[in-house]
Amino acid sequence: MNLTEYPYSSGRRVVMGCNHAAATSQPLATLAGMEMFWAGGNAVDAAIAIAIALTVVEPTSNGIGSDAFALVWDGQLHGLNASGRSPQNLTIDRFDGMTQVPDLGWLPITVPGAVSAWRTLWEKWGKLPFEQLFAPAIRYAESGFPVSPETARAWKWTESLLANAIEPEFQWFQQTFLPKGRSPHAGEIWGSRAHAETLREIAATGGESFYRGRLAERMAAFAADTGGLLTQADLAQHQADWVQPISTDYRGITLWEIPPNGQGI
């Protein structure tokens, strides 16, 4: 492979190094990964720290309530599917009269699996203390950080969808992510102490609070109060699954991916 010539137009540059490398869509998230390397951690420590940091610095694309998939090579390829299941009380009749699953509200919500991925990956390969992986993200959330232009654009789009929503399930989104009644502008400093407190509790309990403790109780209570179907039982029964990766050959290259239910990109 020629690393200095591209068959297409690109403004990106090849970055080389001798020991470690981290690449993300956000420099502060990349820095979170590098901090783990500098502390003596390995690639899995760095990847988890990056994923946690992205819930803060790119909340429009990543979240504590999201799912996660992972491919890890340690001499052989491992696949992890940490996507969540639908709530047990979500029956097919609730979609009567609909032609597709709605984009907003409680109906499309599944059990959030990302936290279980962080814990599961760390248990198998992590080298640093679990709580240490959260330190950069907590720092960004508490002290604030400059919002990137791309994130500001996505945030503005989300504002257009939810700023005037009157349904009770959107109240905390508006208070947290539209604190001035609008989305933050590019370069504006934004942070969330509540986000930091949540991450700190996840870190201190090894993720247990999120699925079987205080955070799980709060999520289930909020769902019950606002018309959601997610329960403490749904959260407690969640687990990440080790899966066999699938592959295909394309132009002499073998491409590996997580099998369905992921979309494979």
What is each of the regions a protein language model found here?
Residues I265:
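Flexible, polar/acidic helix-loop-strand segments at domain edges
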Residues M1-L31, E35-W38, A43-T205, F210-R212, ...:
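Noncatalytic scaffold domains of N-terminal-nucleophile
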